[in-house]
């Protein structure tokens, strides 16, 4: 499994609401249909979120990232994006 975490700090609360609504209704459904395992968006503050995207492998994660390139460029205008990503090292779940 491959995971990508993106931290986004928006210029305003209204920008955050617009982008997260777009993520929920457009980006996530499309990405899930293209092979992403799951996607979650977590609120940090009134203008800050982080997303967690899980993929079966890096190839699929890169394919999904390619689908979002133009959108991410637009989101980055007036926002600060920080990305972390990597292969699952240890996984745990309840028995």
Residue ranges and their predicted role:
Residues 1-67, 77-95:
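Short S/T/G/P-rich N-terminal loop/turn motif that feeds into the first structured element of a domain
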């Amino acid at each position: 499994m491959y995971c990508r975490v993106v931290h986004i700090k928006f210029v305003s609360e209204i920008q955050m609401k617009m982008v997260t609504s777009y993520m929920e209704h457009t980006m996530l459904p499309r990405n899930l249909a293209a092979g992403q395992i799951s996607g979650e968006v977590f609120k940090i503050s009134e203008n800050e979120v982080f997303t967690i995207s899980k993929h079966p492998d890096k190839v699929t994660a890169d394919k999904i990232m390619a689908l979002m390139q133009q959108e991410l460029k637009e989101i980055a205008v007036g926002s600060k994006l920080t990305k972390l990503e990597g292969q699952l090292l240890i996984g745990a779940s309840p028995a």
